[in-house]
C-alpha cells in the first residue's frame, strides 16, 4: 500500500492495513482516536506531523521507519514493531505522555529529537541497547527502559521526578544539564550507573548501580534520597546535602570528592 498526498485523516477508527509493506508520504497525518495503521511487513511514514494520540496505533511486524517533524502520542498512542523502530524527528517535539508507548524487541534508533515529554505513564523501551539524545526530557511518572544498556544525552534539563523510572539493565549512562530525580524518581542499573549533571535534586529519589555508581554533579541535594551500589561508588560534586535520612552507601570502595558535605541525620 502506497499513499501520497498533502494530508491524510485516518482518525476515528480509520484503518490502513496490508500484508505487504505500507508507505505513507504526506503533510499532516492524523491517526488519532483509535486510528490504525498496520502491516505484516514494514511501514514507512514520511510526514510533517503525526497525531497518533488517543489510542492511535501504528504497528509493523517488519521495520517501522518514521521520518517526521513532530509526533503526538498522548493518551495511549502506540508506535511498535516486532523487528525495529527508527524515529527521526528532525529537531521536532515528541509527546508520548499519558500512556503513550514506543517499543520494540529489536533495534530502537531515535534521531534528532527536540523536546521529549514521556511523563504520566509514557513508555519508551527496547530489548536492545539504545540511545536517547534530546534537547530536554520530561519523564515525570514515565518509564525509559533498556533491557540491555541505555544511554541518555540531554542538552538541557532532565526531569525524572514523581516516580519516573529510567533503567538500563546492562548499564545506564546519563549526561544532562539540571537533573530532577526527586519524589520517588529512580535511575537504576544492574550494571554500571554513570551520571553526569549540573545540579542534581535527589530528594526522596534513588540512584542505584549494582555493579558500580559514578556520579559527577555541580551540586547534589540528597535529603531523604539514596545513592547506593553493591560495588564501588564514586561521587564528585561541589556542595552535597545528604541530611534528613539521606544515604550514600556502597559494599565496595566509597570515594567522595566534595567541597562541602552536610550529613545531619543522614547515613554514609
Located regions from the model:
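Well-ordered beta-strand segments characteristic of repetitive beta-sheet solenoids
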Residues: 1-5, 20-27, 41-48, 62-70, ...
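Short, T/G/N/S-enriched strand-turn elements that build extracellular solenoid repeat scaffolds
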Residues: 11-16, 32-38, 53-59, 73-80, ...
Amino acid at each position: 500500500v502506497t499513499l501520497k498526498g498533502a494530508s491524510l485523516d485516518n482518525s476515528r477508527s480509520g484503518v490502513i492495513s496490508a500484508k505487504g509493506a505500507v508507505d505513507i508520504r504526506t503533510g499532516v497525518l492524523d491517526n488519532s482516536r483509535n486510528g490504525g495503521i498496520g502491516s505484516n511487513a514494514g511501514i514507512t511514514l514520511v510526514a510533517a506531523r503525526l497525531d497518533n494520540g488517543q489510542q492511535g496505533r501504528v504497528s509493523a511486524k517488519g521495520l517501522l521507519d518514521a521520518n517526521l517533524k513532530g509526533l503526538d502520542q498522548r493518551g495511549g498512542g502506540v508506535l511498535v514493531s516486532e523487528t525495529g523502530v527508527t524515529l527521526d524527528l528532525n529537531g521536532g517535539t515528541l509527546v508520548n505522555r499519558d500512556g503513550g508507548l514506543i517499543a520494540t524487541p529489536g533495534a530502537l534508533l531515535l534521531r534528532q529529537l527536540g523536546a521529549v515529554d514521556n511523563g504520566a505513564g509514557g513508555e519508551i523501551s527496547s530489548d536492545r541497547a539504545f540511545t536517547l539524545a534530546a534537547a530536554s526530557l520530561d519523564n515525570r511518572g514515565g518509564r525509559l527502559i533498556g533491557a540491555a544498556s541505555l544511554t541518555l544525552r540531554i542538552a538541557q534539563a532532565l526531569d525524572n521526578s514523581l516516580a519516573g523510572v529510567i533503567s538500563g539493565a546492562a548499564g545506564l549512562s546519563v549526561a544532562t544539564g539540571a537533573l530532577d530525580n526527586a519524589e520517588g524518581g529512580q535511575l537504576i542499573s544492574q550494571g554500571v550507573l554513570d551520571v553526569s549533571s549540573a545540579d542534581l535534586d535527589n530528594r526522596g529519589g534513588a540512584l542505584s548501580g549494582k555493579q558500580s555508581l559514578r556520579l559527577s554533579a555541580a551540586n547534589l541535594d540528597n535529603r531523604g534520597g539514596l545513592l547506593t551500589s553493591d560495588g564501588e561508588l564514586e561521587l564528585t560534586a561541589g556542595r552535597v546535602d545528604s541530611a534528613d535520612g539521606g544515604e550514600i552507601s556502597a559494599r565496595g570502595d566509597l570515594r567522595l570528592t566534595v567541597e562541602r558535605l552536610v550529613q545531619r541525620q543522614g547515613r554514609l
